[in-house]
Amino acid sequence: MNFLAIFWFLMMPPSDIWLSDFLKARTIAKENHQMILINFSGSDWCGPCIQMHKEVFEKDDFKAFAKKNLVLLKADFPRLEKNKLSTQQLKKNNELALKYNPDGDFPLTLLLDENLKVLKVWSGNPGLNSDEFVKEIKLILK
């Protein structure tokens, strides 16, 4: 049984989940020659963040595209006690915000190449559906 669980975990594509560790995301992006999509979010208090997740990131077409092309990295800053981050994770998110979101915009989504060059920034909820969001990324891929 343990072998099956390990095999299943190893076979999961890296972009099928939102990572929370920048170093891990960077390593995966380098190894697979993929872009990194960083999303700064307030998952339990930021209305536009919640809306963007529902209308873009939770949609099947976005997930299918991301699975093949992106490493997803979420820097969440929840406020409710029940969603409180570990001290270590909060420190990682704050360090990431200092570099990529110094103004504290929510939501803020960035597309980076495998060498960490910022290719595109979406400040706030851009009001795109998942198909439109994917099309914007595809234009950058060309």
Describe each region flagged by the PLM:
Residues N2-M11:
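Sec-dependent N-terminal signal peptides
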Residues M11-D21:
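A domain-start/cap signature at the N-terminus of enzymes
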Residues C49-F65:
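Typically the conserved alpha-helix immediately C-terminal to a functionally engaged Cys/Sec
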Residues D60-N125, N129-E132:
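Thioredoxin-like thiol-disulfide oxidoreductase module
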